[in-house]
Amino acid sequence: MLLMWYAAAMKQNVDYIFTHNFIDQNYYKGLTNKPTHILQSLLIEDPLKDLEIKTYDQRTNSAIIGGNFSQWYSGFDSYIVAREFSENVAAPSMGRSQHGEEQVVQKVPHIQWKDWMSHLNSFRYAVHMMRTAAAGTFSLNCAYLGIPCIGYSIIDTQSILHKEVTVQVGDIGRARQLACRLRDDREFYDHVSHQVQERYRRFYTEEIFLKKFYEVVSQ
């Protein structure tokens, strides 16, 4: 009943729908006749104006996974790929947690977002093999910092910003190959790092977000 109410409310009470991902756009287009637009996830840059983005040599030779070790975040997939970089794999503390995961990953405690970005800045590699279409803020944060993030193509921030290290859902083999190449090929790492920052500036800045938003609401 709740889902039926939700669908009816969308049809009656909204003028248009914003989604984060291409796959979401198709879903809502099929559910309702309302105009549906992709509006990218947003990173607020002002709190980070004093954050100095670290270089390759300033970062630890280790990986952090997006989400945590739970099934919801496909933590096992991320962990298997991240182990190609280092035996020590870090993961943020999340609302959904897996019993005993602290024995497998080094948990990052809940901290303010600005502190989180400073902490993320210390890692050389990132992995986020999430199978669910979500906002993609982890991949977005990594792109801002120039950290290559291996992940599945279902999330737009992953497939657009980190396209050289994006794989189809379930392709663990290809993801592990890319991890090994990032680890062993410095030229490839530098190329990906540069490209993700360049694409962030091209597609995901606050100015681009606002431009797209006002283009829709002013119609």
Question: Where in this protein do the model-derived segments appear?
Answer:
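Carbohydrate-associated surface elements
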Residues: 23, 42
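Acidic donor-binding loop of glycosyltransferase active sites
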Residues: 118-134, 147
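Short alpha-helical segment that forms part of, or immediately flanks, the ligand-binding pocket
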Residues: 117, 139-145, 158
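Membrane-proximal helix-turn-helix segments that form the acceptor-binding/catalytic region
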Residues: 1-17, 30-31
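Conserved catalytic-core segment of nucleotide-activated headgroup transferases in glycan assembly
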Residues: 44-113
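Conserved acidic donor-binding loop of glycosyltransferase catalytic domains
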Residues: 150-153, 159, 167
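A charged, aromatic-enriched C-terminal amphipathic alpha-helix characteristic of glycosyltransferases
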Residues: 184-218
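Conserved acidic donor-binding segment of nucleotide-sugar-dependent glycosyltransferases
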Residues: 163-173, 181-186
